[in-house]
Amino acid sequence: MISRPTTEQILNNCSRELTEVVLPAVEDETVKVTVMMLDLVLRNAALRAAHEIAWMTDEIAAMHEFAGSAGPPTVPSLHLDAVVEAYGAASEAFSAAMESAVAAGDDAKVRRGAELMDRRVGREEELMAGWTPVGR
């Protein structure tokens, strides 16, 4: 029993139940594949739940710095919707700055922007944990 469960813990416990209790009881191969896919979704959601807001706030600051903003706007709260909205605004600022750097031929800034994008893609790949529809 978890006395103070986080979303990550709840999802990981559901994943464990699927793989340790449900999956061994399933005989149909198609259903086994479905259970394995659900397990991947649960584990990915657990990882995202544990870190998503921190990852986005880190990227918000980095994108605004790249864009030359005076400073990232204060996110009104740590509720996911507010952080996602701030992340979207930071992404727009980053995109505009990257377009300007490309148009100006500023290779150093383009490289820095590419590094930021590589970091984002790397984090997304980590988050997806190699997600592909299993067996399909």
Where are these regions (language model features)?
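Mid-chain, well-packed structural core segment of small domains
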Residues: 68-92
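A ubiquitous short alpha-helical element
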Residues: 1-7, 26, 78-84
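N-terminal interaction modules that seed assembly of large macromolecular complexes
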Residues: 3-4, 12-60
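Charged/polar positions within long, soluble alpha-helices
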Residues: 19, 23, 43, 47-54, ...
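Amphipathic alpha-helical binding modules
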Residues: 84-136
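Hydrophobic/basic alpha-helical segments enriched in Actinobacteria
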Residues: 15, 32-39, 63, 69-75, ...
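Hydrophobic faces of stable alpha-helices that mediate helix-helix packing
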Residues: 8-15, 35, 87-95
